[in-house]
């Protein structure tokens, strides 16, 4: 699946001397998943309602033309966190390249069998090792006294491999427990922000929920809003997912 960076509230603090600033900025990095670039109110969409994102965009500098050299999840996330193109950080796919597993019929069974193989696990370990050879944003910020949190999509093993001080992902292929963020709860993120503020620590929070990515299971109250005005039932579900994601941004900003 494709990932589209949404509103990346990342300030260019790494290029500055933090000692020269009165106070290091807090950073919240927001990444939506499988979200068409035009499906925002501030981008002119009439199909979806995104009031919270529109408000954020109105307060921000918006870059409407962004391009990636690899539209897969893992490589794109690696580029966001390292500031490097794919050919430099070396993460060219979500998974290591593997031959087909014999005896496993069906795409689902074949994928499950492959991901349990020793060769696959070793390949993933090598990808993570390669990723760690690049400068990684949470690690660099940690050297400047930041605390950091990983939530949502994450392909590079447990959150610690990215230099985060806290996180939800324990090491699953693309996020495991981290994928609960946004869909089931915002507590890990809001609790982290409250704790960092209480402790007087500058923070970096990575919010990359699996929204509006499938499975498209929006709340019924939102789906009902789009049933009659979307061209297809599937489009209605997707549009409702986009607004659901927007609601989480409002909840976070209100915290």
What feature does the model see in each segment?
Residues 12-255:
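Formylglycine-dependent sulfatase
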Residues 1-8:
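Bacterial N-terminal signal peptides that target proteins for export
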